[in-house]
Amino acid sequence: EFRRVLFRSGDGFISTPTFDFGKLAISGSKQQYGLKKAADYYGNGTRNPYLRIKKTQPNWSLTAQLSQPKSATDSLPTATRLLLGAAPVSSFSNYNQPTELKNAVGTTSAISLNANNTATRIIANQQFTGSNIYQLDFTFNNVKLEVPANQGVKGQQYQAAITWNLVTGP
């Protein structure tokens, strides 16, 4: 899935990731499940999901929140978590030009989103500066869905949404 959200100011998301964990077993203990491996999904795990941001303001921050995973007839508890690990952050110069350069600028803290729609700070104001385009790479093998014990109904498909919030301004 490719979504592009840009605002009149030009600020917004150039690309947001989709996380698919495939079919999971119901377990009697808390479990962490990795992303599914498939040829048509991030190159069978050889490519990383990423979030790419465009912003024009020098002051900006990023938060994310995870909704409660739901199926047609069931919900996973709000104690369910999406673990993204620490994400390397890169900036771009000459973006979308033949001379484009991607530069490593740092790493986020380990990212953990609870499935309760609570905003979690990913990047603080002025944590990264000097560019208008940034990318967070989520290491494929570090992305996990943590499900509490005895949760889920066999045969159900659960979906949740990550809301990425780019805050810009003076």
Language model segments and positions:
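N-terminal small/polar-rich segments of proteins
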Residues: 3-103, 135-170
